[in-house]
Amino acid sequence: MDHGRLMDDQMMLGSQVYPYTTQPQNSHCIIVNQIDGGEESKPVKRRRKRRSKGSSATNEEDVAEIGGMLRKRKLTDEQVNMLEYSFGNEHKLESGRKEKIAGELGLDPRQVAVWFQNRRARWKNKKLEEEYAKLKNHHDNVVLGQCQLESQILKLTEQLSEAQSEIRKLSERLEEMPTNSSSSSLSVEANNAPTDFELAPETNYNIPFYMLDNNYLQSMEYWDGLYV
């Protein structure tokens, strides 16, 4: 009995010091309000933290800053023309030049840097497109020239085949012809050939005497002396 009363006194003291205790129920822990007598087990709800006034003001400032940056991104035509002119002179943007351009145009240096970065990217893409167009045009010309060469090769191959066929036909005809007939035909053609040096029998050839020189007369006398 004394031991049980001692345990009750300790529990009563603990409930006064710790008003909320946990009691196991169906293998789950439930927070019990000891001050209310523990008649009903009510789970404790967590309260959401309220934002302080300073934090809300900070968020509003962030939104305003973002809106200001968005407004700064809208450039006028004059600013765009000046930036294009500066980019045409020099594609790279150094820190001193960036500050100078930003001061002249009334822009933020970061905005100028971002504009130059985007402009360089567009410029590089354009250069790549131009280089690709040149290479594609060169490739198309090479392919066209190759097709023309292949067509010429086919024509020349056909002509060569026809020439070889004619050569074979001529060789076969020469092999079929006998040698005697060829020699007789050649002799007949030689006999029938006209002779330009044959003299007509009834023609008188009178050579003037005065055309004969002394050497010719001396030779004639020499030959006449031999036959006397």
UniProtKB/Swiss-Prot annotation:
Please give the superkingdom of this protein's source.
Answer: Eukaryota
What SMART domains does this protein's entry cite?
HOX (SM00389)
What processes in GO biological process is this protein linked to?
Answer: response to auxin; root development
Q: Which GO terms describe its cellular component?
A: nucleus
The UniProt annotation puts the region (Disordered) at 36-62
Q: Where is the composition biased (Basic residues)?
A: 44-53
Q: Name one Pfam family in it.
A: Homeodomain
> Mind listing where the DNA-binding region sits, in residue ranges?
68-127
Task: Enumerate the GO terms in the molecular function aspect.
Answer: DNA binding; DNA-binding transcription factor activity; DNA-binding transcription factor activity, RNA polymerase II-specific
- Please tell me whether the keyword Nucleus is annotated for this protein: yes
Question: Looking at the keywords, is Ribonucleoprotein present?
Answer: no
Q: Which parts of the sequence are annotated with region: Leucine-zipper?
A: 128-156
Question: Where does it live in the cell?
Answer: Nucleus
Kindly state the tissue distribution recorded for this protein.
Expressed in root meristem, late flowers and siliques.
What triggers or suppresses the expression of this protein?
By abscisic acid (ABA), by salt stress, by indole-3-acetic acid (IAA) and during darkness conditions. Down-regulated by cytokinin.
Q: Which InterPro entries match?
A: HD, HDZip_class_I_plant, Homeobox_CS, Homeodomain-like_sf, HTH_motif
Q: Could you list this entry's UniProt keywords, alphabetically sorted.
A: DNA-binding, Homeobox, Nucleus, Stress response, Transcription, Transcription regulation
Family, according to the entry, reads as follows: Belongs to the HD-ZIP homeobox family. Class I subfamily.
What's this chain's function?
A: Probable transcription factor that may play a regulatory role in auxin/cytokinin signaling during root development.
Protein name listed in UniProt: Homeobox-leucine zipper protein ATHB-53
Name the encoding gene, please.
ATHB-53
